[in-house]
Amino acid sequence: MRELALQGGRYPEVDMAFALNQIAGWQTARTKLPSWAECADIIYPPHLSMEQCSSEQTALYKASLVEKGVSMTDLTGGFGVDFSFIARRFSSATYVERLADLCDIARRNFEVLGLHHADVVCGDGVDFLRTMKPVDFIYLDPARRDLNGSRTYALEDCTPNIIELRDVLLEKARTVMIKLSPMLDWHKVVDDLGCVSEVHVVSVRNECKEMLVVLRRDSNAPLRCYAVNDDETVVFRASDAVASTVRLVSDTSEIRRGSYLFEPNASLMKLGCFGLLCERYGVKKIGAHSNLFIADESVDFPGRKFQISTVSSMNKKELRRNLSFITRANIAVRNFPISSQDLRRQLKLKDGGDTYIFATTQGERNHLILVAGKV
């Protein structure tokens, strides 16, 4: 890329800025949008739009949630990735985007992708919403950056303001899906919007990517939550999570060699349904603020699973005796008074290997070092 940019003067007939942008976009698409990267005629947008667009994996997940219907509208079109997958579920699909350049790109790409039923509208999504005919489904991905380009995390600070538009959205469609930042408090989102029937927290390779909120007109069904991590999905009713009780380890003696250690995946961490995990999987939480769980038996837990080989206090002699055979380890701290870097220096261990060390707290002040291997 850099060499090509430096040689731009040798090819005056080539729009070098455009060419470099297409190469960079394709390189990103190879991992983010593999089916698009295989299509030679796709046009890629500027870097920010590529950075902000959904991945193919998360777009496919959204499409899987949508019932087949007659008509849908995406009010915040962007690069059009989500639209391109969801639109295949409908006979008629409208993409709305205020930036003319993105509309031109979308119009071309939709033809290339065989979405001949897609209608591209260049205009403001809110203005279009107020005058559009009712449809079966509306999708929005509100902007989460302010005028200065800084990220915003409050629902009311997103553009457009979904809270203000809720009623008109539900007048125009029976079902509305909104993509939000996973940084938002999902409890507050539900309270702010009302009419929420589903909350999906979607992770890819245990990295939280997005929160999806589904609103349905006149729905009396209980709120359901979906913790998604790649092909693994945990579903529960929000009311069941509220009614569940966290089971805590009452004494350090319950944490011993041979015990199984579990760490929930990123989506479950975000949803925070820890009591439900205790009841559903028969595990106990090590501490009130330590989001690690143990059990005597191995269970099919949604997250990382380890088996403990050594349990140690922070006593120097005990540490020396228990960790003398370890030269390198992956170190994680969970509710612990020092950082993983400081602990690594204190234990004089190199990074990596097959050994995992979890530093955590049982009870109020019982600091523990758990040495474990992945199962």
Language-model features, listed with the residues they occupy:
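SAM-dependent transferase fold signal centered on methyltransferase-like domains
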Residues: 1-375
